[in-house]
Each structure stands twice: as C-alpha cells, then as structure tokens.
C-alpha cells in the first residue's frame, strides 16, 4: 500500500478482530473481506497474531494493522511481518518511535482536548477518540473538528450501523468497529456468513453516502 493514510481516508471502516482461537480469527478476516472490508486490525489476543498479520499483508487491496498494542516490542513484531499501522488505546512514545522508525502509520488514543492536541503535537497520524460512547458520541467529534479542523480523528468504542455515517459526516477520518461487526456470539457459533452480511451493511451504507455526495 503506497499511501496508507489516504487509504484510511477513502475506506473509513477499520474492522477489529478479537478471538481466542487463531482459526476463528482467520475465518473472521475472510468473512470481513468477503463483505467488502479492506482495513483489518488484529489484536494481540489472537493466538499467533503475527502469523495472521503476515498472511493478510500478502493480500492485494487489504490494509492490515496491529490493534490494542501495549508496547513497542509488539509493534515491532507486527510491522516486521507486514503490518502497515499500529493502534493503541493511549499515547505511548515507545510504540510511536517504533512506528516512525519503520514507516508505519501510528494511531493512538485520546479522550480529552488536551490529550488530542498533545498527540497531534507529538506527530501521531490518526488520533483515536476512545471510548467515544462515554465521551459524547457524535456531538463530541463534531465539536472537536469544528474547534480543531486539523485533527484526524478516529472514533472507537460504540460505533454502530445506526451512527456510523453520523461520525463520518461530523468529520471523522475513519471509524473503528469491533463488536458491532463480529460479536462474541457470532464467533462462538461460527456464523461467518452473518459477519459477512454485517460487513456488507456497513460498506453499502458508506457507498450510499459517497453516491449522495
């Protein structure tokens, strides 16, 4: 992927995979891709998460990254096998340094205006506003963007099919979507086709916005 940041701006949907079995995570990834999702985030909770990242990184037109990173060592391992971005819930300078030294996009979390500005000043590419469902939801993103239009914001935590487009219209660069795409019940029941259908609902909704514009 020549320009990952532009890809985030175009695709808008970041799908997060959490699973207790590697085979389940692999099946989820395939189901999401079948549903039109092109940005996939693998968390360290997935057994052999670097193996899955490596396999997904070989696919054309799929951007894969590490999510919920907690330290620079995790970030390096993921980037070393093909991850093009690393995301964490908070600002961590070690993760930031690893990403910048290895030409990977860095997404780090913020909750307050001060944290968001500090993240921007540090040089973080995308600022994850987390958990957005406890921070004011769409109006909070709208206010942040109105006051600080230079911030590239990625709401996470509680983004649903019903409010997804509202976040995009409010100025979010992209949205992180986890349980509303692949909840634990679907994973336990191996209902991969339902995950594909949910993915299609999100991607079709995004297409409807693009057409309207």
Write out the residue ranges for each language-model feature.
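Conserved N-terminal beta1-alpha1 strand-loop-helix module at the mouth
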Residues: 1-81, 101, 150, 161-162, ...
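Catalytic beta/alpha-barrel core
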Residues: 16-18, 38-46, 63-70, 83-91, ...
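Glycine-rich beta-strand-to-loop/alpha-helix junction loops that act as flexible
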Residues: 66-67, 155-158, 175-179
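Glycine-rich phosphate-binding active-site loops on the catalytic face of alpha/beta enzymes
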Residues: 89-95, 128-137, 172-191
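Anionic-ligand binding region
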Residues: 113-127, 137-140, 144
